A protein has these predicted regions:
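N-terminal active-site segment of His-dependent metallophosphoesterases
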Residues: 22-106, 187
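His/acidic metal-ligating clusters that form di-metal
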Residues: 25, 81-88, 163-243
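Binuclear metal-dependent phosphoesterase catalytic core
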Residues: 25-41, 46-47, 63, 146, ...
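Beta-strand-turn-beta hairpins that frame and shape the catalytic cleft
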Residues: 50-61, 145-155, 182-190, 237-243, ...
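Stable alpha-helical elements in mature extracytoplasmic
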Residues: 56, 69-76, 92, 103, ...
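Active-site glycine-centered loops adjacent to acidic/histidine catalytic or metal-binding residues
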Residues: 65, 93-94, 123-124, 195, ...
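Core catalytic region of metal-dependent phosphoesterases/phosphodiesterases
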Residues: 73-148
Length: 272
C-alpha cells in the first residue's frame, strides 16, 4: 500500500468520524447562541406606538408565567387571536423555567403566532443560568417603556434576588427618566408591568416603600400588573389606592384583558 493510498484512507476515515460526531453532539443547554428573530421588544414597541398613535381607547391582554406549559400557551395565543379585539399583548415574565436557551426560543416561536404585537418582561426564572443574556438578545433591555395611545407603559425588572446587587433592581434612575419622558410628552396616565410585585420573595423589599413612593410621583397611574406567584389576585398592597393585578401562570388557563378608555379602564379575567 502506498503512502498516498494510506493517506486517502485515513482522510476518508476522519471525514466519516467527524460527520458521525456532529450528529451526536448537541449544544450546551446554556449556550447563548440564538437562532431566529432577535430584538423583539424594540420592533414590537414601534408597531404598538404606530398603530395606537392618537387613540384614546384600546384593549390589551396580559399573560404570564408560561414556563413549561407550551400547550396552554398555544391555546392562549389562539384564544387571543380568535377574539379579534386585542391591540397588543404583554407577557409578565418567566417564559423559561431554568433559563435554558431553547426554552426562550420555543416560547418566542409560540408568541410569534400572535397577529398583534407583544412585548415581554423578564421573570426571575428567566435570569437563571445564562438566561438573562439570552433574554437581552431575544427581547432587549430588562427595563423598557412605550406609549400606547395617550398612556405610558413602564416595564421593570424587579427580580432583585437573582442579581445580588450587581445591578440596581428596581432601577430608580430608569423610573425617574420615564417620569421626565411623560412630562416632556405631556402624557397624563400610565401603568406599570413587572414580574414580581413588592412584598414577594424576589423583590428587594428593603426599598419596597421607596418604590411605592416613586409610583405615586407618576401622573395618572392607573394600575400595576405582575405575575410570579401563579395566582389570580387584585391587591392594594400598601392600602394607598394603587391596585396590583396579578396574572396567574398560564397552566390556570386564564389571561387578563384591560380595556382603556377616556373615563378610565375595565378589567376582565378570561378563562379559555
Amino acid at each position: 500500500m502506498t503512502i498516498k493510498t494510506l493517506a486517502n484512507i485515513l482522510l476518508a476515515f476522519l471525514v466519516i468520524c467527524s460527520t458521525a460526531a456532529c450528529d451526536m453532539l448537541e449544544s450546551h443547554p446554556y449556550d447563548t447562541r440564538v437562532t431566529g428573530e432577535t430584538g423583539i421588544n424594540a420592533k414590537n414597541i414601534q408597531r404598538i406606538e404606530s398603530l395606537l398613535k392618537g387613540r384614546k381607547s384600546f384593549r390589551f391582554a396580559v399573560i404570564s408565567d408560561t414556563q413549561r406549559w407550551y400547550d396552554a400557551t398555544v391555546d392562549a395565543v389562539n384564544s387571543i387571536r380568535d377574539r379579534q379585539d386585542i391591540d397588543f399583548v404583554l407577557h409578565g415574565g418567566d417564559q423559561s423555567d431554568f433559563g435554558v436557551t431553547k426554552e426562550f426560543l420555543w416560547m418566542r416561536d409560540i408568541m410569534n403566532r400572535l397577529d398583534v404585537p407583544y412585548v415581554c418582561a423578564i421573570g426571575n426564572h428567566d435570569c437563571l443560568g445564562t438566561g438573562r443574556d439570552v433574554f437581552r438578545t431575544v427581547y432587549g433591555d430588562t427595563n423598557f417603556a412605550f406609549t400606547a395611545g395617550d398612556m405610558r407603559f413602564i416595564c421593570l425588572n424587579t427580580n432583585a434576588l437573582e442579581y445580588d446587587y450587581s445591578e440596581p433592581v428596581p432601577d430608580f434612575d430608569f423610573m425617574t427618566a420615564q417620569l421626565d419622558k411623560m412630562q416632556q410628552d405631556s402624557l397624563t396616565r400610565c401603568a406599570f408591568l413587572m414580574h414580581a410585585a413588592p412584598q414577594t420573595d424576589v423583590f428587594n423589599n428593603n426599598v419596597a416603600k421607596v418604590f411605592q413612593h416613586y409610583l405615586h410621583m407618576f401622573p395618572g397611574l392607573q394600575f400595576c400588573m405582575h405575575g410570579h406567584t401563579h395566582a389570580l389576585t387584585v391587591k392594594d398592597i400598601f392600602d394607598d389606592g394603587i391596585l396590583y393585578y396579578q396574572c396567574p401562570n398560564i397552566d390556570k388557563r386564564i389571561y387578563l384583558v384591560f380595556t382603556i378608555n377616556e373615563e378610565g379602564y375595565d378589567y376582565e379575567a378570561v378563562e379559555y
